């Protein structure tokens, strides 16, 4: 008596976390140069993440060479999986061969294929933050379980990457880099580069007891030390967070 053969595959609805890249220029040379400048030295930033390309912020007469952007992203270890476009942009946007996605990163209803069987939600849009309030002490932000703790100073050229929160108990020197998917806590001078929320966590923060960094970044929004830090924060305890897609510096109260 024959038994029913088990299927070798199935196609079903699903979800995959994805980042959302929104170019604001169709000048691919400039865009590629800026992406390379920001991320070529931090290959862990994307680490083979999937990414949706949102072209809706481009002007009506602009057409981005998406195939070239995909090539640039691939070189930075990011994998483009679709394009978010307005109805007017749809024709040229999908000419690159990537599927069209809706504003949430999902393939529109009624369009199904093996290549796009799984719907892909985009990273959440930033939610406007409430009016600024007095800076809370460090204890106000819960540390994620399994935080990485570094007890030695980080010298120039050293780089540390944490999947959750990162705690550094000694100096982060010029040229050193601390990267975390969660929050970053530096209980010493922060003189190098600190990148928190690198997987798109808009709630991530950076805390340090002496603010002197070359660069700070939260969820890809960054500021460099080329412009002097405000006197109220330079070489002082501070925390950095996002508010309405802008980096906000606040004094850190030490108990």
Swiss-Prot record:
Bias (Basic and acidic residues) ranges: 103-115
PANTHER family: SEPTUM SITE-DETERMINING PROTEIN MINC
Gene3D superfamilies, per database record: 2.160.20.70, 3.30.70.260
Biased composition (Pro residues): 127-136
Keyword Cell cycle set for record: yes
GO terms, biological process: cell morphogenesis; division septum assembly; regulation of cell division; regulation of cell septum assembly
Top-rank lineage group of the source organism: Bacteria
Homology family: Belongs to the MinC family.
Subunit composition and interactions: Interacts with MinD and FtsZ.
Keywords, ordered alphabetically: Cell cycle, Cell division, Septation
Region named Disordered: 103-136
Transferase recorded as keyword: no
InterPro entries named among the record's database cross-references: CAP/MinC_C (IPR016098), MinC (IPR013033), MinC_C_sf (IPR036145), MinC_N (IPR007874), Septum_form_inhib_MinC_C (IPR005526)
Protein name: Probable septum site-determining protein MinC
Function, in words: Cell division inhibitor that blocks the formation of polar Z ring septums. Rapidly oscillates between the poles of the cell to destabilize FtsZ filaments that have formed before they mature into polar Z rings. Prevents FtsZ polymerization.
Native source organism of the sequence: Ralstonia nicotianae (strain ATCC BAA-1114 / GMI1000) (Ralstonia solanacearum)
